[in-house]
Curated annotation (Swiss-Prot):
Catalytic activity: tRNA(n+1) + phosphate = tRNA(n) + a ribonucleoside 5'-diphosphate
SUPFAM superfamilies: Ribonuclease PH domain 2-like, Ribosomal protein S5 domain 2-like
Keyword Membrane in annotation: no
Family: Belongs to the RNase PH family.
GO function term, MF aspect, one: tRNA binding
Protein name per its UniProtKB record: Ribonuclease PH
Gene behind this protein: rph
NCBIfam families: RNasePH
Entry-linked InterPro entries: ExoRNase_PH_dom1, ExoRNase_PH_dom2, ExoRNase_PH_dom2_sf, PNPase/RNase_PH_dom_sf, Ribosomal_Su5_D2-typ_SF, RNase_PH, RNase_PH_bac-type, RNase_PH_CS
Keyword field contains Transmembrane: no
Length: 241
């Protein structure tokens, strides 16, 4: 046990990860992903149309929407629909999810159709965007498998797996997969998106307290690589079940 983390986890230890496929019945892909107490419902919906800028080009599109239930956190938040617009954080996160998933898709093989990943946070305890990316990939694969089974596409457009994890410096120690208690009190917070080839798709890093050093950055990236490998294994296990 580590006494430096509120949860007692070791610095390089993920929270328990659960990836449950087929969580709802109507969407082509549906996954409940849990990173500890963070729970996100990820659904993949297929539509036989593309945005205007892609019409007639023979390419598909992958996009994402992200939202939180009003009581996903300690206190209730108004629904963004009631406010009449999405917040900046919501837009930032859903664009991140969309970019991350497009990085693993051959859009020519998808044809002129759109797959939308809807990521709804049921309960938030840190790492909602990384959980959303990790779960949305599995939902995306299930949706693609439906298209293949129906004969709508001839070639699998999935280029490889994608997963994401948070890392940070908490009380002077680089740690993996921050929960809310750590995320709200860390010196550095970073989200790392990677593919199964070890390539980095996106890095989002911020010094919350003091500037981080190069050696701390290297340590954080090393932790992220370890965590993503474990998440990729969890994705594969879920898809093989």
């Amino acid at each position: 046990m580590s006494d430096s983390r509120p949860s007692g986890r070791q610095p390089d230890q993920l929270r328990p990860v659960v990836i449950q496929r087929g969580f709802t019945r109507h969407a082509e892909g549906s996954v409940l992903v849990c990173f500890g107490e963070t729970r996100v419902l990820c659904t993949a919906s297929v539509e036989n149309r593309v945005p205007g800028f892609l019409r007639g080009k023979g390419e598909g599109w992958v996009t994402a929407e992200y939202g939180m239930l009003p009581r996903a956190t300690h206190t209730r938040s108004d629904r963004e629909a009631a406010r009449g617009k999405q917040g900046g954080r919501t837009l930032e996160i859903q664009r991140l999810i969309g970019r991350s998933l497009r990085a693993c898709v051959d859009r020519n093989a998808l044809g002129e159709r759109t797959i939308t990943l809807d990521c709804d946070v049921l309960q938030a305890d840190g790492g909602t965007r990384t959980a959303a990316i990790t779960g949305a990939y599995v939902a995306l694969v299930d949706a693609v498998n439906v298209l293949m089974k129906r004969g709508d596409i001839k070639r699998n457009p999935i280029l490889g797996a994608v997963a994401a994890v948070s890392v940070g410096v908490y009380r002077g120690t680089p740690v993996l997969d921050l929960d809310y208690a750590e995320d709200s009190d860390c010196d550095t917070d970073m989200n790392v998106v990677m593919n199964d080839g070890g390539g980095f798709i996106e890095l989002q890093g911020t010094a919350e307290g003091h500037a981080f050093r190069r050696d701390e950055l290297d340590a954080l990236l090393g932790l992220a690589e370890k965590g993503v490998r474990e998440l990729l294994d969890a994705q594969q296990a879920a898809l093989s079940a």
